[in-house]
Amino acid sequence: MAAAAAGGAPGPAPGPSRPAPAARNPPAVPRRRGDSRRRQAALFFLNNISLDGRPPSLGPGGEKPAPPPPPPTEAREAPAPPPAPPGGLPGLPARPAPQGLLSPTTAPAGLGLDGQRQRRRVTSQRCSLEFLEDTVGCASVQRTKHASGSPRHKGLKKTHFIKNMRQYDTKNSRIVLICAKRSLCAAFSVLPYGEGLRISDLRVDSQKQRHPSGGVSVSSEMVFELEGVELGADGKVVSYAKFLYPTNALVIHKNDSHGLLPQPRPSIPRAPPGSRHKPVPTKSTPAGTELGSDGGDAVEYNPNLLDDPQWPCGKHKRVLIFASYMTTVIEYVKPADLKKDMNETFREKFPHIKLTLSKIRSLKREMRNLSEECSLEPVTVSMAYVYFEKLVLQGKLNKQNRKLCAGACVLLAAKISSDLRKSEVKQLIDKLEERFRFNRKDLIGFEFTVLVALELALYLPENQVLPHYRRLTQQF
């Protein structure tokens, strides 16, 4: 017994030392099992993705897809070791089960085929997943573009690589300059210039007729032209040299054989030294001798004519003259009758003016209110009044172009008398567009027309500006 105990003592000693590696292996088993479950869930999720629009619960034939087979990695996993018998007898057959992992059997061949199939399936699923992600990404980008309001491009325009531009018609197309290696140098578009292609002309029938005055239809000739003002349209060259006169006294004009040079306008009033305003010559020549003159030009401008306080009285006043003083008695009359009487009296005295006196004063009030909103100085408003009244007295205004003329006069006066920045000019144009309800493109195009109608005389003498300035300062 002692020998058996002594001889059997070494028997169980290697037993506890052998399962030492086996004791380290079991922690890897749950990890591989968890990986297989994750892979199985991923494959099941990818299989349920429908690329043809069918619901994921139905297959191609309308049948439910079979559940995925169990992963082959589970066959490789070692079963849980049985509990050790009591007493630790070595004669129990406890080793054949783990021996199957190391013994060469037919299972590895089947497992290799299943592994290859699984790899192919995973590869195909990855490819399909990448394709799906690309498709969804493109769709999302398109949805965001269309949701933002940008129009869909039906098709790209054809691109031509040309060397001679005379062989191709580049109308309504974009021209791109490239190098020999086809790298971009510059891209630009050519916009044609002409009276027939003006955007404002196309908008006359659509936008301008929404707010007509007096039920009068708006035409392009009335809106964009002033009566008696000739512009260089349809390729015609028009010279405005007749509106210029020499200011340098050292220049000596010599007569040549072709004819006499035009003499400077006589009796030119000079502005005092240090003044910014350019003097305007008086009209001493008879009407018709100068180019571009009409019936309204022969009368010298009077800044107190349209602002005479006697106009609102009309025929409803009675003048009483006494020995030492004179007084006026005005009877009570309805405002509508007084306004009608005033306009009739004004039309009788100035038959060539197409606007009523009440409408002229209403436009001047709009100009003053606009100048207050834009913080313009009273001298700027006074100059705008002078420009506007000159056009009125010349008979160049009508019901269609009166607002454009008023806006252009304010814009010219602000540019010539104030040191405005770009942002301030933009703000002024926005205010003009909002108050007078016209398009800014029409205003900018009409600005030069008003400048020609004023004979390029934007610098005014003080005797024309000061009366308006005094009245404005009293009102402010």
Curated annotation (Swiss-Prot):
Residues 1-119, 256-295 are annotated as: Disordered. The modification Phosphoserine is found at S128, S206. Gene3D superfamilies: Cyclin-like. Keywords: Cell cycle, Cell division, Cyclin, Phosphoprotein. InterPro entries: CABLES1/2, Cyclin-like_sf, Cyclin_N. Widely expressed. Coiled coil: none annotated. Residues 30-40 have a biased composition (Basic residues). Residues 65-96, 263-272 have a biased composition (Pro residues). GO terms for biological process: cell division; regulation of cell cycle. CDD domains: CYCLIN_CABLES2 (cd20603). Unknown. Probably involved in G1-S cell cycle transition. Belongs to the cyclin family. Binds to CDK3, CDK5 and ABL1. The C-terminal cyclin-box-like region binds to CDK5. This is CDK5 and ABL1 enzyme substrate 2. It comes from Mus musculus. The gene is Cables2.
